[in-house]
Amino acid sequence: GCHGKTTTTAMLAHVLNSIVGANYLIGDGTGYANKDNEYFILESCEYKRHFLEYHPYYSIITNIDLDHVDYYKDIDDVIDAYREFANNTENLVIACGDDQYTRFLDLTKPVFYYGITEDNDIIAKEIEYSENGIHFEVEAEGNYYGTYDLPFYGKHMLLDALACISICYYERM
């Protein structure tokens, strides 16, 4: 996505590393590798279509926005780049269904949408914001999938966490 990549990558690295062990390379330069780990989490960027070099097993698209205006001519050019990236995914695309552009991708790959609106595959419900962070329940494909507490604030942090929860759900963790 254009925003939230580093946060989502760091969250996913933390979660998977605590469950099964994971290698990762985050956009801020943080990385870790262990030859025994099965998973590798990589933050990639849409700038100059650099992300088209990758063919991930899963891809997460947090959002699409007109960014890098020195390179992309308009939002349709950005959407075309994301479409090509997503179609390079080997297994499943996980995308924020609440984003105004992700549903325009018209992909050949299966897509699993996350968000807070009812038309997503995985949904945050009963959301409560407090001085301690965010408390919410998750419904995945119509079934209760757990209650979560995040020590973070804001809707975007909630959506980034839902992207990570979506990977865990799909991997049956």
Report residues per predicted region.
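Phosphate-binding loop of NTP-binding sites
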Residues: 1-110, 162, 166-169
